[in-house]
């Protein structure tokens, strides 16, 4: 699974640094700046929430997967724009893996 994320990280970095905004969607987002990227993340988040609600009622899980992929993608573009990667998020998830959710929450509050 993480191989896909690693490859996507590479592509996002390439498009950020050398992509043509006229021919690359990712380069175009980077060119427009963080606010445009955040707008897309928010849009995809809303679409994912709506797809989850629909999936609960009509079992259309494929649409939910599609929208979640869009949300992840645009979140990765956001991370890339800020000099971060999927690996940074995976490392944080790994760090939390052995903690209970309540323990993690307590650590953040102290």
Curated annotation (Swiss-Prot):
Molecular function GO terms recorded: ATP binding; phosphoribosyl-ATP diphosphatase activity
Reactions listed under catalytic activity: 1-(5-phospho-beta-D-ribosyl)-ATP + H2O = 1-(5-phospho-beta-D-ribosyl)-5'-AMP + diphosphate + H(+)
Superkingdom classification of source: Bacteria
Enzyme class: hydrolase
Enzyme Commission number: 3.6.1.31
Keyword Transmembrane attached: no
Record keywords, A-Z: Amino-acid biosynthesis, ATP-binding, Cytoplasm, Histidine biosynthesis, Hydrolase, Nucleotide-binding
Pfam families referenced in this protein's UniProt entry, alphabetically: PRA-PH
Family: Belongs to the PRA-PH family.
PANTHER family assigned: HISTIDINE BIOSYNTHESIS BIFUNCTIONAL PROTEIN (PTHR42945), HISTIDINE BIOSYNTHESIS BIFUNCTIONAL PROTEIN HISIE (PTHR42945:SF9)
HAMAP family for the chain: HisE
Identification of the protein by name: Phosphoribosyl-ATP pyrophosphatase
Gene: hisE
